[in-house]
């Protein structure tokens, strides 16, 4: 039956005059699932579930705000002419890298106030973050955005993907590459990889591995997209940021191994804010 699904309406349902979009539902579902998955790691590390809720909730809230601000900044000519659309986040238009910046800063502040080690907390929630990102890409699918360039329908059929995806890649009279799907699959693989590696890695390295893995996939997928935020006519913002995050992740793992020899993730309980 799923193969017969026709073009999907971005609006899931209405509550009176209020339209509830699939985009928001899917992103919220990804965050909620990520929270439940992170509970196991938090419990093992001795991090109280209320502390986990505070970190995830407030990081998500401020992450959404900075994700929107980031997007608006790089599309400023449009929003300067249409300022009423700036708060219309349900139309899409949030940038994951902007969300990561806001979420990271918020998480660090909460960790500092509550005497938690931010890198240990990062290790706990990194698998949840990348899984939520993978799920969230289906919100882009429902909004018919974040796709690649035009392709023939036969190209999509030869990929052996479900027909409902092919149907919804038909936008404004043309078929497009489902780049949302490429990134979603990459993120889900990253989720499995991080869970497998985490027990073997040292404190902080799961989080830095997340930055590296996600950024590698994002760099290549971004090159296929048609809606990239551009720094110049030839430089895509997300690709530049991805390169920086890869370098930061690799450098931090190497530096901390040689400088501090941090303990393995599996060998420690709750760590305080680093002295």
From Swiss-Prot:
GO cellular component terms, semicolon-separated: plasma membrane
One GO MF term attached to the UniProt entry: phosphatidylglycerol-prolipoprotein diacylglyceryl transferase activity
BP GO annotations: lipoprotein biosynthetic process
Main location: membrane
Keyword terms: Cell membrane, Membrane, Transferase, Transmembrane, Transmembrane helix
Subcellular location: Cell membrane
Pathway listed: Protein modification; lipoprotein biosynthesis (diacylglyceryl transfer)
PROSITE patterns in the record: LGT
Membrane topology: Multi-pass membrane protein
Pfam families per the UniProt record, alphabetical: LGT
Annotated EC: 2.5.1.145
Family affiliation: Belongs to the Lgt family.
Full protein name: Phosphatidylglycerol--prolipoprotein diacylglyceryl transferase
Naturally occurring in which organism (per UniProt): Staphylococcus carnosus (strain TM300)
């Amino acid at each position: 039956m799923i193969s017969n699904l026709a073009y999907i309406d971005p609006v899931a349902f209405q509550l009176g005059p209020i339209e509830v979009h699939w985009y928001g539902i899917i992103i919220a579902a990804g965050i909620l699932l990520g929270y439940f998955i992170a509970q196991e790691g938090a419990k093992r590390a001795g991090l109280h579930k209320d502390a986990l809720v505070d970190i995830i909730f407030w990081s998500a809230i401020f992450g959404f705000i900075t994700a929107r601000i980031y997007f608006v900044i790089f599309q400023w000519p449009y929003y300067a002419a249409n300022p009423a659309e700036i708060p219309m986040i349900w139309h899409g238009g949030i940038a994951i890298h902007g969300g990561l910046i806001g979420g990271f800063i918020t998480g660090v502040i909460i960790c500092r106030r509550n005497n938690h080690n931010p890198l240990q907390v990062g290790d706990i929630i990194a698998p949840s973050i990348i899984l939520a990102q993978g799920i969230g890409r289906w919100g882009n699918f429902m909004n018919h955005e974040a796709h690649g360039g035009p392709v023939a329908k036969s190209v999509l059929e030869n990929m052996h993907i479900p027909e409902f995806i092919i149907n919804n890649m038909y936008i404004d009279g043309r078929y497009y590459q489902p780049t949302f799907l490429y990134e979603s699959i990459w993120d889900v693989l990253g989720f499995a990889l991080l869970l497998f590696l985490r027990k073997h890695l040292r404190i902080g390295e799961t989080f830095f591995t997340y930055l590296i893995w996600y950024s590698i996939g994002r760099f290549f997928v971004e090159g296929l997209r048609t809606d990239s935020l551009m720094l110049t006519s030839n430089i895509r913002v997300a690709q530049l940021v991805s390169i920086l995050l890869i370098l930061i992740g690799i450098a931090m793992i190497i530096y901390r191994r040689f400088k501090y020899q941090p303990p393995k993730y599996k060998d420690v309980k709750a760590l305080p804010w680093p002295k």
